[in-house]
Every structure is written in C-alpha cells, then in structure tokens.
Curated annotation (Swiss-Prot):
Domain HTH gntR-type, residue spans: 1-69
Gene from which this protein is expressed: ydcR
PANTHER family named among the record's database cross-references: HTH-TYPE TRANSCRIPTIONAL REGULATORY PROTEIN GABR (PTHR46577), TRANSCRIPTIONAL REGULATORY PROTEIN (PTHR46577:SF2)
Pfam families recorded: Aminotran_1_2, GntR
Residues carrying N6-(pyridoxal phosphate)lysine: K312
Gene Ontology molecular function: any one: DNA binding
Name of protein: Uncharacterized HTH-type transcriptional regulator YdcR
Entry's family note: In the C-terminal section; belongs to the class-I pyridoxal-phosphate-dependent aminotransferase family.
Biological processes, Gene Ontology terms: alpha-amino acid metabolic process; biosynthetic process
DNA-binding is among the record's keywords: yes
Alphabetical keyword list: Aminotransferase, DNA-binding, Pyridoxal phosphate, Transcription, Transcription regulation, Transferase
DNA repair recorded as keyword: no
Amino acid sequence: MKKYQQLAEQLREQIASGIWQPGDRLPSLRDQVALSGMSFMTVSHAYQLLESQGYIIARPQSGYYVAPQAIKMPKAPVIPVTRDEAVDINTYIFDMLQASRDPSVVPFASAFPDPRLFPLQQLNRSLAQVSKTATAMSVIENLPPGNAELRQAIARRYALQGITISPDEIVITAGALEALNLSLQAVTEPGDWVIVENPCFYGALQALERLRLKALSVATDVKEGIDLQALELALQEYPVKACWLMTNSQNPLGFTLTPQKKAQLVALLNQYNVTLIEDDVYSELYFGREKPLPAKAWDRHDGVLHCSSFSKCLVPGFRIGWVAAGKHARKIQRLQLMSTLSTSSPMQLALVDYLSTRRYDAHLRRLRRQLAERKQRAWQALLRYLPAEVKIHHNDSGYFLWLELPEPLDAGELSLAALTHHISIAPGKMFSTGENWSRFFRFNTAWQWGEREEQAVKQLGKLIQERL
C-alpha cells in the first residue's frame, strides 16, 4: 500500500470510529504534513482519494470537511488488475490536472484540443437564442433520454455511415464519460470482471475502481491495437461481463483498428456473450478521406454500447455526449435519473440550434485540417530537438503522439522535472496499473504552435539528454 493510501486508510478509520464527525473540519494540508511527517504531495493525494470515495468534501477557501454520510459508508476496496495488483494512478492524474489549470504551463499533457479551434461565437449565439425562447416545459422535454431533435440529429449521422439506430435507442448524457459510466453500470454488478486495454484511457480505470469492478488489462499494440489472441485467453479464463475499448484514435496510443479487426472483435465478444462498451469520442478526428466506422457497425446482436460526445470535436464546455444503448436504453435512463437527473437543458437546445445551421460539417473539415497541420509541425519539432534514442509513434488521426524513452529513463520522473520548467507531459503510468509503460508518455499536438511551444520542446530535449 502506498503512503497516501496508508494515510487515507488511517483517516477513514478515524472517521468510522467517530474521532471525526460529519461536518468536522479536517486539519489543513499543511497541518497534516506536520502531523503525519509525510510530504505535501502525499497528503494531497490522500485527501483527493478520500474525496473521490465520498468520505470528505472540499469547500473553496475553507478546507476539507467530513461528508455528512461518511460514517455510514462502507470501506471502498481497491480493485485488482491482476490477482495481486491494485489500481494506483491518482498521483499522475492529479499532477496532470493541476498543471493543466496553470496558464503558465505548456499543456502537452492536456487531454483536450485547443479551445480556440472551436466555433465558440456561433455556439454562444445559439445559446443566447434558445435562452430567449426557452419555456418551463423545456426542462421536462429534455429529461432522459434527452432532447428529441438532438437524438434525431445524432441518429441521422449514424445513418450517413450506413448504421441504423433509432432515436429511441439514444440517451443524451453529460459528456461521454457519463455515457461510459452508465453503460458500465447497466451491464455489470460489483465484483464483475471487465476487460480494458493496456494502456487505456485513465477514466476507465477510475470508473472500475468507483464501481468496485475487477479489471483485466489486455496487451495492446501501438499500431495494431488490442491483441485478439490475448483477449480470447482472458475470455476463456475469466467470467468477463464487459469490455471497454476505443477503436478509433485510441487514447493514448492513437491507433485506429482496421475494419477486419473490428469485425473480429465484435464476433469474438458476441461468442462469449460479453458486452462491448465502445468509447468513440475521437471518431471525427480522422485525417483520411472517409470517417472510420465504429465497431457498432458490425453489431448484429445488440451487444455494443456505442458512446461518444461533442466535447473533443465541437465544444468541451457544453458536456453533451450520448450512448446508442439499444436494449439497455431504458435501464440507462433510470440510472441517469438516479444520478445526474438529466443533461443541461439549455446546452441541449443550443446544440440543436447550432446543428440546424448546417455549419457543423464545415467546422469538422476545418478542424481536421488544422489538427493534421499542428500534429505534423509538433512531430517535426520533436524530431529536431529530442535525442535520436527517443522513438515517436505517429498515427494519422487525432492529436496525440506516443513517445518512448530509452532505458533506463522514467517518464514519470521526466514529467516532474519538466513541470519545474512549466512544461507538462502525460506519463505512461497514468494509463496503466503496471510498470511496462513507465518509459512512455503522451504528447498533445492540438495547441497552437508558436515560440513558446518550440522552446518547450527544445527544453524537453535537454532534460532527456541530461538523463541519457
């Protein structure tokens, strides 16, 4: 158990025994450092863990307090990735999120594209327009499964790819992450086994931990994607209930599965009666002539829950996503009503208004062109300034590059050193519970390139060279 986990466990026991009562203010981070003798970062991570588990709450400018229901809560177990490994990615996630909030830090670690790429003025006009015409009934009309016009517009976009999905099968959510979490809840129970890629989007690992599910990480190649032979071995050995994968522009590696492999994947999971939860948030960010099909296109047995959003291609702040849920649509609606209740009504209406202008596809074409140009420029800068021993894995979609450091360098240590120079990168351990990706890091190429970015890459090259 890590030090921050030990401290969190100690505080949990104190809360359970009544030493700290609901509503009590906990010692400040600095006071806890003095009391425990641990580092500021360790204490921060312990408090973050307790907050994520619902034991404490943070109040701005005030501190941390014991949550009202904390004493009644059962202890939340850590989840094994194998029989003897536990998820431990909070340190890296915390550092990345903290760094991304600081405008002085070059955000190569960010998961989002540059917001200046989005048509914010047009979207704001749409939001202003619907604010004038919204009625009291608008809130009711936009309760789960969501705005009917928006669901119809999404269904039409599926139809453009030859995929028939009824608007009644679509549930609008507060971003793709809610769609993915609700999908996971709909098909699993605590203690079930779920397959994820290795490496995978860190939100998947957090979701499994929160829902008390067991994770099986399956080997995933930087170009070819998930190893289907390894996947079948896992399906044979464990009673797997769901499989959470990205098939297009995978985060963090960047690959897109071939049509043949998508078909094989769907057939294999159907053979073992395992639901595929398809995370497809980057599907619009392709650089080729045709949009890649999701695995959902090969689904003939209603075994794929296809999740996506407008966050990575249109507007992150609106937090509008969806799941094509098929037979699980009503259950997902019920789960949503018990959690977030519904997705923002004004945001749904504004998106319907914007999509009605038919500017969306023109925006997407422009966005893809700009992302491709920026990715090429960043790649060239990395080739120019980084030592030749560093391998740069490049895929023709999305806005991530996956970099491999030579042995014995550690990307986690490099990321901390880079932060002292106001540069953020996303270390490989953020995306896995094991140590096999410790020499890798993800690099965001979507931000506008200028002298600051050029100098940041140059400094990154110096830091790597010093460690060779």
